[in-house]
Amino acid sequence: YVNNTYIVLGTKKGIIKKTSLEAYSRPRANGVIAITVRDGDELLDAVLTNGECEILLAGRKGRCCRFDESDARALGRTASGVRGINIDEDDEVIGMIAYDPKAEDAEAHSLLVVSEHGYGKRSEFDEYRKTNRGGKGVKTLNITEKTGSLVAMKNVTDENDLMIINRSGITIRMAVSNIKVAGRATQGVRLINIREGD
């Protein structure tokens, strides 16, 4: 935890909450409240940050919001958070990333997105312009009937491997370096063949 001073929590309805790690320094046997989740929402992810990261949130409909972590002030443990991305009522957030553009290896990182019908691609972080926290964001994958909705978003490097497991249990593994880097608003390439109903 030496380089991380905050924890950022994200929910499926696009709410984020940044809290100092110090707020969790006195755990109790029955746990501590980390966030008050509103009705109809649920916690999606938690990431550790150094206070100087950028947060990226993406929804199933293919839009991604990138903003400075400093746009969200630190809140107490029981607070419910602030709007991170503005999504439609029938949409939900599928991924949250904390990216440090000042890190030594920042150039080596790219954003990987995968759709429900097995399409995916990598894009440079610079392809995603910064927007205000709570905005609609920009298109991250060209969502079509062929691609299906967005299901995953990850911060990757060429040294990483990607594993995809479908509902019927078929697993494929590939080197991230084999997935070409493409523009932000393209549909990507087929990573796995998905059968009807899978």
Residue ranges and their predicted role:
Residues 1-198:
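Short, structured "edge-of-domain" segments at secondary-structure transitions
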